[in-house]
Amino acid sequence: MKRHFERQADYCSAFGADLTARLLRQLCNCTCASSALGQRIFNWPGDPAPEADNLPLRLAGGLHALLLSKKARELAPIYRKGAIADANMQTLLQAVLQRHDAELIAFIENAPQTNEVRRAAEIIAAAHWPKAYNGCDLIASELGASAGLNLLFDKFHLALGDGYGPQNSPAAKVQCY
């Protein structure tokens, strides 16, 4: 299981999600196989890999949900860069995992909802072609669990060269590197 968490942490690092990468690396050493949550994780009925059920992101999402719902406010330093040392982070995570065992078990039963606006860059670029060459608009339909924000691609501004999309977009500016 540890390799799945490490691999997902590597993916997060590669995409600039350093806080999530650090969280996942700490979780590698926090999940106790004897707890109810640990039993659920280590006996996952599907494929826990990042490319499949992505159990690491499910657990990371569950922890973030606990913070956002104010059920585990003590997690806040984890989401502020440099606010907590690794050893303290691990101790904090172990306490939160134990205290919110049942809630986290329920949370990981569902796939993570990532909705990364960065992924809209490809859709924005693709939508430009039919409009530019045929005067047609691209119509997007729900693509799956993570399609929500991507369906609003026409509200984003793509900052690539001269850019594409409304420049005064309050939604997002998608930077392409």
Language-model-derived ranges and their functions:
Residues 1-49:
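Non-catalytic accessory regions outside enzyme or core folds
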Residues 12-19, 34, 70-73, 103, ...:
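Short secondary-structure junctions and interdomain/linker hinges
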Residues 26-32, 57-69, 122-129:
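Short, hydrophobic/amphipathic alpha-helical patches that form generic packing surfaces
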